[in-house]
């Protein structure tokens, strides 16, 4: 009788059960996608945290300031997977601006603020992530044409010292973008400041 009744309904009858199942399956697929994205983001965040921690530990291993600078542009850069690291120090003596280190770059007073803000009348953020402006060429030397994105970390080296900046350059234009979080780099910058202050006494 049930079968006969179903046959008499014809093709114009809407199968509510099938529609409900289709909707449930679509919702389940969306939940699965969300779940996968959340797990992937968690793994990426954990990997980034471990990466920064390893870089900090390597940075703190140096027993001399010269070794610290060598490690910074060498193993620390490798751990962070960046293609260039430069420490920019300001000097109030323009006549003494000679750069002999591939890690440290001396610039005139006011350079850090102007570089981070691109000359705009605004306060410089502690962490700035962006595509490399054309003005960045002088910081990266012979690698300038390859660097496509950068992280600018404004560094406070203590009272009575001019501002400084640590820049990390990458050949990947998407490695540093303005919509990314900056918590890990803020932490790295804080440790970096303390380590450099220790060397500077």
Question: PLM features: what roles do these ranges have?
Answer:
Residues 101-133:
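Acidic/proline- and glycine-rich, intrinsically disordered low-complexity segments
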Residues 62-101:
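Helix-loop-beta substructure at the N-terminus of cytosolic sensory domains
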Residues 170-187, 196-200:
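Regulatory loop-to-helix N-cap segments in sensory/regulatory domains
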Residues 159-170:
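Sensory beta-strand/linker motifs that couple input domains to effectors
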Residues 125-149:
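Signal-transducing coupling segments at domain and membrane junctions
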Residues 148-157:
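A short, aliphatic-rich beta-strand micro-motif
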Residues 1-4, 198-201:
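Signal-transducing coiled-coil/dimerization helices and immediately adjacent hinge/linker segments
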Residues 11-59:
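Signal-transmission linkers at sensory-effector interfaces
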């Amino acid at each position: 009788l049930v079968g006969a009744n179903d046959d008499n309904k014809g093709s114009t009858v809407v199968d509510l059960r099938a529609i409900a199942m289709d909707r449930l399956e679509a919702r389940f697929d969306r939940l699965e996608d969300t779940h996968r994205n959340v797990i992937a983001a968690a793994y990426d965040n954990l990997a980034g945290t471990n990466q920064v921690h390893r870089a900090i530990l390597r940075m703190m291993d140096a027993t001399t300031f010269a070794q610290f600078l060598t490690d910074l542009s060498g193993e620390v850069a490798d751990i962070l997977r960046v293609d260039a690291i430069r420490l920019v120090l300001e000097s109030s003596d323009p006549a003494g601006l000679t750069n002999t280190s591939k890690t440290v770059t001396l610039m005139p007073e006011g350079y850090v603020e102007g570089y981070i803000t691109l000359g705009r009348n605004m306060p410089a953020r502690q962490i700035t992530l962006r595509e490399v402006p054309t003005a960045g060429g002088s910081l990266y030397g012979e690698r300038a044409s390859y660097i496509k994105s950068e992280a600018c970390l404004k560094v406070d080296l203590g009272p009575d010292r001019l501002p400084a900046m640590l820049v990390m350059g990458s050949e990947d234009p998407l490695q540093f973008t303005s919509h990314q979080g900056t918590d890990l780099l803020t932490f790295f910058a804080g440790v970096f400041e303390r380590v450099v202050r220790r060397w500077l006494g």
